[in-house]
Swiss-Prot record:
One of its GO terms (biological process) is bacterial-type flagellum-dependent cell motility. The basal body constitutes a major portion of the flagellar organelle and consists of four rings (L,P,S, and M) mounted on a central rod. Assembles around the rod to form the L-ring and probably protects the motor/basal body from shearing forces during rotation. The keyword Cell cycle does not apply. It comes from the Bacteria. The gene is flgI. Keywords: Bacterial flagellum, Periplasm, Signal. Belongs to the FlgI family. This is Flagellar P-ring protein.
């Protein structure tokens, strides 16, 4: 007989270790503006293309199940002047149809290289050792902006023999470092008549106003104006040649962060609990119980009663499941003014992260949790 108790997850202290370390940080920190915001219009553009990877060691697409691979290969060969007879059934195992994606950065110029991601779209077993053939990469306007080609680097590993196989990470995708060459630039317009818009990464009136104050102190009143909780309007030089120097100084200005919104993030699937340093709790009383599941399994053997017959010995599992829930005692949670005190108070409950899901929700409903509760 084997006994397998299903214990709950470890205590909150292990889950909230990263959150507790944040308590040692200062209440307000100054960061560079470039880490908090981006200039409107300065962004990357997504590119996509369809291509073929060749040179695989028998791990390519099975063309009977992926006819588009054979069709693509036939079309490519015809462009190279090679005619494949109609109705030919090429049983190739070293070719795979793939989708190629890349991000064209802002201000990219012809001749610049970018990384590409290669992903199998058929039933290829592995792209290891393959070479991507010349693949046009198009943007949303269906125009070609880059050409990709090169050897695919696959991060996974695997082997199979005798019907058994082992695999580490995925083998159906890889990357080509500097695998695409930019052929056409994307027009980038971010300054008109000296006006530039700065977009904060997070919507916060306090931080946005602090950024405007820092800019106005450096360049004079009226240089920055808050449009809303996320957008700043900047008045820069009218001469386009002076705009890069102006924006470079803007990016490196230190900005004091406003206190963040108190928030607790709970992952209901994994039991992870993360909270920021502005979370506080009021005094409350909490009672919780522990749930345990015990499974007992015993194999019983049944043999035929009459010897020398066609009866067979049968092994039948006998499984018993027992659920136990221990009563919880009412415990007092004291008022906590900072993250370290919050973690200490919740640890004193002895609750597991799974129990903490219900406890935090109940504390929020009772008004004892001074934070926004978000369950993902």
């Amino acid at each position: 007989m084997t006994q397998r108790p299903f214990s709950l997850l470890s205590h909150l202290g292990r889950i909230c270790l990263a959150a507790a370390m944040l308590a040692a940080l200062p209440a307000q920190a100054a960061e560079r503006l470039k880490d908090l915001a981006t200039f409107q219009g300065v962004r990357g553009n997504q590119l996509i293309g369809y291509g073929l990877v060749v040179g695989l060691d028998g791990t390519g697409d099975q063309v009977r199940q992926t006819p588009f691979t054979q069709q693509s290969l036939t079309n490519m060969l015809s462009q190279l002047g090679i005619t494949v007879p109609a109705g030919s059934n090429m049983q190739l195992k070293n070719v795979a149809a793939v989708m190629v994606t890349a991000t064209l950065p802002a201000f990219a110029r012809p001749g610049q290289t970018v990384d590409v991601v290669v992903s199998s779209m058929g039933n290829a077993k592995s792209l290891r050792g393959g070479t991507l053939l010349m693949t046009p990469l198009k943007g949303a306007d269906n125009s070609v902006y880059a050409i990709a080609q090169g050897n695919v680097l696959v991060g996974g590993a695997g082997a199979s023999a005798g019907g058994s196989s082992v695999q580490i990470n995925t083998l159906n995708g890889g990357r080509i470092s500097a695998g695409a060459i930019v052929e056409r630039p994307v027009p980038t317009s971010f300054a008109q008549d000296g006006l530039v818009y700065l977009e904060m990464n997070n919507s916060d009136f306090g931080t946005t106003q602090n950024a405007a104050n820092a800019i106005n102190r450096q360049f004079g009143a009226g240089t920055a104006m808050v449009m809303d909780a996320r957008v700043l309007q900047l008045r820069g030089p009218l001469d386009p040649s002076q705009m890069p120097a102006f924006l470079s100084q803007i990016e490196n200005l230190p900005v004091t962060l406003a206190p963040a919104v108190a928030k607790v993030i709970i992952n209901a699937r994994t039991g992870s609990v993360v909270m920021n340093r502005t979370v506080t709790i009021e005094e409350a009383a909490v009672a919780h119980g522990n749930l345990s599941v015990i499974i007992n399994r015993q194999n019983q053997v049944f043999q035929p009663d009459t010897p020398f017959t066609d009866g067979q010995t049968v092994v039948a599992p006998n499984t018993q499941i027992e659920v136990r829930q221990e009563g919880g005692a009412l415990q007092r949670v004291r008022t906590s003014a900072n993250l370290a005190d919050v973690v200490k108070a919740l640890n004193a409950l002895g609750a597991t992260p799974q129990d903490l899901l219900a406890i935090l929700q109940a504390m929020k409903a009772a008004g004892a949790l001074r934070a926004e509760l978000e369950i993902i």
